[in-house]
Design a protein with these regions (language model features):
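Juxta-kinase regulatory segment immediately upstream of eukaryotic protein kinase catalytic domains
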Residues: 79-123
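Conserved kinase catalytic-core helix
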Residues: 173-176, 180-183, 213, 219-254
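Short, glycine/acidic-enriched loop or turn micro-motifs at the edges of active sites
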Residues: 211, 258, 280
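Hydrophobic residue at the +6 position relative to the catalytic HRD Asp in the kinase catalytic loop
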Residues: 256, 261-263
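Activation-loop N-terminal segment of eukaryotic-like protein kinases
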Residues: 263-269
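C-lobe/activation-segment region of protein kinase-like
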Residues: 271-351
């Protein structure tokens, strides 16, 4: 019958209950909960106003634009913009959010010299030459140091109409690597050239050259140090905690080939490792990292073809450095003994051939 009250619907029901003696004897508790529930609401509901009798005592919050939403970083206490910060999984590769050209402070003169003397760059040591990408070792004048100059052609121009260029992504990923405290190359400058502000013609990135280093292909079958078990084991023990650190913060490398992980030192005790070529890296949400971390572990194990005991030691070092790993050590080994890739099943722990 109380639905026949003056206030129709749900309001009529509560009007009837309010008129009954003792029904809302603990009304002050309801009001306290209502204040806590609706204090961040832009508009107070009719139900809230009906019970509390107040409408404008709580200040209205300001609506924050989506582009200014911020959150706390896992690695620092300061706030960050979730769409541009290098450690945010929300960050977008849109080139309008980032500079088209960037130079480290104090490197402007050297950058101008490199751009004005392309013959000096081309005369340097050519480190790699792949499809649309060349990397040179360039010595700066007056003994100001040595840099690595990577030049990329405008390959697949439609892919970069709205997105960052290949060096632009690498510059952004190096920022994340530096924030995590992982040893890697230091970016000094990057830039790109576009036609009509849309089609990318070429781009470049300059990093400080890491002297006296070699890449991890030395430890692959046929490599210069493949038979040096002590150096190979030390190499794996050094990169495992760094990979775990990446994954703990949602950093998916996507290209953990030994050629992209340099080492320096002639003895296991003096060895250091450095990560390079991070253009393909992505930030991912933690709940999606299961498949990505398996791929990042599969890649170096497949390339190095480690003996079973060394492969298990590598996984144990990774797991010990990753307390939030979604797998137990046994589950991690089991997943990588039957890892499916391109329709084939790989056993990268025991070194069995693909099936």
């Amino acid at each position: 019958m109380f639905f026949q009250a003056h206030r129709p619907g749900i309001h009529g029901a509560f009007f009837y209950l309010r008129s009954q003696v003792g029904i809302l004897s603990d009304f002050h508790l309801f009001r306290e909960n209502a204040d806590r529930l609706f204090e961040k609401s832009e508009k107070k509901s009719n139900l809230y106003r009906f019970f509390t009798g107040i409408e404008n005592q709580i200040p209205q919050p300001q609506i924050t634009p989506m582009s200014r939403i911020r959150f706390r970083s896992k690695t620092r206490d300061s706030e960050m913009n979730i769409f541009t910060d290098p450690l945010s999984p929300w960050r977008l590769p849109l080139r309008f959010l980032y500079p088209a050209n960037w130079c480290a402070e104090g490197f402007e003169e050297d950058l101008a010299w490199i751009q004005a003397h392309p013959e000096a760059r081309n005369a340097g040591n050519l480190l790699t030459d792949s499809s649309g990408k060349q990397v040179w070792r360039v010595e700066l004048p007056d003994g100001r140091g040595v840099v690595a100059y990577k030049h990329c052609e405008g390959k697949a121009p439609s892919r970069y109409i709205l997105n960052l260029s290949h060096p632009g992504r690498e510059w952004r990923n190096y920022q994340a690597i530096a924030r995590l405290g992982i040893p890697a190359g230091e970016v000094l400058a990057f830039g790109e050239t576009r036609r009509h502000h849309w089609r990318i013609l070429n781009s470049f990135i300059i990093t400080r050259f890491i002297e006296n280093t070699r890449d991890g292909t030395d430890f692959m079958p046929g490599g210069r140090r493949h038979g040096d078990a002590a150096m190979r084991r030390r190499y794996c023990m050094l990169i495992a905690p760094e990979i775990a650190k990446m994954h703990r913060h949602g950093f998916f490398h996507k290209a953990l080939h030994p050629r992209n992980i340099l080492y320096r030192g002639e003895t296991p005790e003096s060895m250091e490792v450095f990560f390079i070529d991070v253009a393909r890296c992505r930030m991912r949400f933690q709940w999606t990292m299961m498949q990505f971390l398996l791929f990042d572990l599969y890649t170096p194990l497949r390339d190095l073809k480690l003996p079973a005991d060394e492969a298990r030691a590598f996984l144990k070092a990774y797991h010990d450095s990753s307390p939030d790993c979604p797998f137990t050590l046994a589950e991690l080994e089991q997943r990588l003994t039957c890892y499916r890739r391109h329709g084939k099943v790989f056993d990268v722990v025991n070194g069995a051939p693909a099936m």
